[in-house]
């Protein structure tokens, strides 16, 4: 992992920790062994302690989010493999606006890391109220009296609703919750989380706009051919 991040020029300080079982290596994820995410402007890297693969998502200007895995068990000749169906089951459907995209969710989580889907979830971007963010994520850093769902595990499912997080705020040390030595950084910074949520949403918007433009240009060219017009003649329907 350190060698890969160094090659990609991604800083370990970008580390985020998510403990909900909501990724392809869900059997490796729990509040004691969260999945780590690292990112820069265009690349996202997912790492599970003792996982079989490192997960990568790249924001491609033409295709949108493109997904890869790097086999961690083959240290002599590591190979990065393109992934399609496995990742696009979640990252290419309605939850990413119908285009290959990135998905950030906030939900209630049981002590073993399983999401409690019967209680619903929030799809998170920069417009989501702070009080609804970070369910299933660790959050470190100071934020005053503002409430959020980070660092919170539902231990009593019979507790009165709505469930709230009244104690796990302004956390600076995660060493009592997980073995921080297994990760490249000790925390899951609140500022990095907010940048991540904004950036993934913008990447999805850019992908959606690009797909719409490509579809419009394809429609325009075919309509012009049918009308005997130059293929690049603008149509009102593609200029809206």
Where are each of the predicted segments found?
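N-terminal alpha-helical interaction blocks
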Residues: 1-50
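Sequence context surrounding c-type heme c attachment/ligation sites in exported
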Residues: 46-240
């Amino acid at each position: 992992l350190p060698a890969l991040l160094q090659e990609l020029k991604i800083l370990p300080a970008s580390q985020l920790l998510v403990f909900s079982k909501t990724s392809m290596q869900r059997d490796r994820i729990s509040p004691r062994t969260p999945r780590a995410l690292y990112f820069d402007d265009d690349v996202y890297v997912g790492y599970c302690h003792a996982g079989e693969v490192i997960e990568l998502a790249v924001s491609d200007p033409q295709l949108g989010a493109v997904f890869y895995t790097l086999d961690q068990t083959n240290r002599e000749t590591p190979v990065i493999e393109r992934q399609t169906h496995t990742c696009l089951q979640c990252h290419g459907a309605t939850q990413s606006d119908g285009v290959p995209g990135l998905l950030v969710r906030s939900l209630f989580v049981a002590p073993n890391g399983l999401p409690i889907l019967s209680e619903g979830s929030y799809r998170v971007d920069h417009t989501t109220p702070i009080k609804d963010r970070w369910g299933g994520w660790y959050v470190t850093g100071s934020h005053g009296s503002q409430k959020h769902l980070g660092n919170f595990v539902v231990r009593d499912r019979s507790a009165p609703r709505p469930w709230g997080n009244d104690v796990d705020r302004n956390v600076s040390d995660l060493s009592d919750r997980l073995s921080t030595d297994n990760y490249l950084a000790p925390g899951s910074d609140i500022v990095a989380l907010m940048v991540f949520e904004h950036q993934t949403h913008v990447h999805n918007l850019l992908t959606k706009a690009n797909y719409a433009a490509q579809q419009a240009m394809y429609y325009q060219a075919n309509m012009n051919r049918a009308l005997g017009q130059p293929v690049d003649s603008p149509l009102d329907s593609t200029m809206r």
